[in-house]
Amino acid sequence: MARSIKKGPFIDAHLLKKVDAARASNDKRPIKTWSRRSTVLPDFVGLTIAVHNGRQHIPVYVSENMVGHKLGEFALTRTFKGHAASKKAKR
């Protein structure tokens, strides 16, 4: 179920504060955040946000196509190494 339009998009206050400061100072360094649940706003376009994936911060360059999605969608938390090969297929 999607979030109500009446409520508006969710964004952590501390992340919004960091984004506003980066916009004001025209700073190009990545903004570190642990807030995977925050929605990407149009103000974020052109910035690099380092999103935590549980182990490290993954730099995500925000483009216009990402607006409306959550930051966590762009920093994967699981690494798929592939299924184990069957012994029958090896012969």
From Swiss-Prot:
> By its UniProt entry, which Pfam families does this protein fall under?
Ribosomal_S19
The record's keywords, sorted A to Z, are: Ribonucleoprotein, Ribosomal protein, RNA-binding, rRNA-binding
Record GO terms (molecular function): rRNA binding; structural constituent of ribosome
Query: Please, which domain of life does this record's source organism belong to?
Result: Bacteria
Read off the Gene3D superfamilies from this record.
Answer: 30s Ribosomal Protein S19, Chain A
GO CC terms in record: cytoplasm; small ribosomal subunit
Q: Which GO terms describe its biological process?
A: ribosomal small subunit assembly; translation
Q: Which InterPro entries match?
A: Ribosomal_uS19 (IPR002222), Ribosomal_uS19_bac-type (IPR005732), Ribosomal_uS19_CS (IPR020934), Ribosomal_uS19_SF (IPR023575)
PANTHER family found in the cross-reference section: RIBOSOMAL PROTEIN S19P FAMILY MEMBER, SMALL RIBOSOMAL SUBUNIT PROTEIN US19M
Q: What does this protein do?
A: Protein S19 forms a complex with S13 that binds strongly to the 16S ribosomal RNA.
What family is this protein classified in? Belongs to the universal ribosomal protein uS19 family.
Record-given protein name: Small ribosomal subunit protein uS19
Organism, per UniProt? Azoarcus sp. (strain BH72)
**Gene for this chain:** rpsS
